[in-house]
Amino acid sequence: RRSKKLLIYYNIDTPLRSHHKFNEHKEVGKVVDKILSGEKIALISDAGTPGISDPGFLAVRTCLENNIEVECLPGATALVPALVNSGIPFERFVFEGFLPVKKGRKTRLEKLTNEDRTMIFYESPHKLLKTLNDFSNSFGADRKISVSREITKIYEETIRGSVEHIINLFTDKIPKGEFVIIV
């Protein structure tokens, strides 16, 4: 989608193959076979860094298991700018990514109630209020958090305050964009 537009813009005509959570187990073997036969492969992501709340880990691990060295280029991931811009101490932090949707969500949050490191979560707009309400119940309505959206894009925004304050803001304003929540 976005990657193809970028490649076209720079006149790069390398063939693209989709690699996503629904096909990565099937595709990873093909990727390894191509590399072992001498082809060069690049794993790119439409938004963020492969393997960070995106498919990619399985491909990297399988390559390493087959003695294929992987070169990782530094690139964008929303968690670092959101963390730095949060105003919350981040000497030690833990990346949680997306919380489980149903099974295991409550258990995961219960385990995190005693976490003393800064926590980083990803969330989609249609689940943001539910997640914030879950945070209020698990971590307390007065807990200071930061919510960033659309990192490095035109409508980038970071809101800081208590969980309760941010819930009130998004109750009146429909959430848009992809979110990074720092707790």
Predicted feature locations:
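Short, acidic/turn-prone active-site loops that include or flank metal/cofactor-
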Residues: 1, 18-25, 76, 97-101, ...
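Class I S-adenosyl-L-methionine
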Residues: 1-71
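RNA substrate-binding interface of SAM-dependent RNA methyltransferases
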Residues: 1-15, 79-80, 84-94, 103, ...
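Short hydrophobic/aromatic-enriched beta-strand-loop microsegments
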Residues: 13-20, 70-71, 91-97, 142-148
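Small/polar loops that bind or transfer phosphate-bearing groups
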Residues: 19-20, 44, 73-74, 97, ...
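Short, well-ordered secondary-structure micro-motifs
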Residues: 29, 54, 82-84, 106-110, ...
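A contiguous loop/helix-start segment that scaffolds small-molecule binding in enzyme catalytic cores
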Residues: 39-40, 117-118, 122-183
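Class I SAM-dependent methyltransferase SAM-binding "motif I" and its flanking Rossmann-like core
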Residues: 58-115
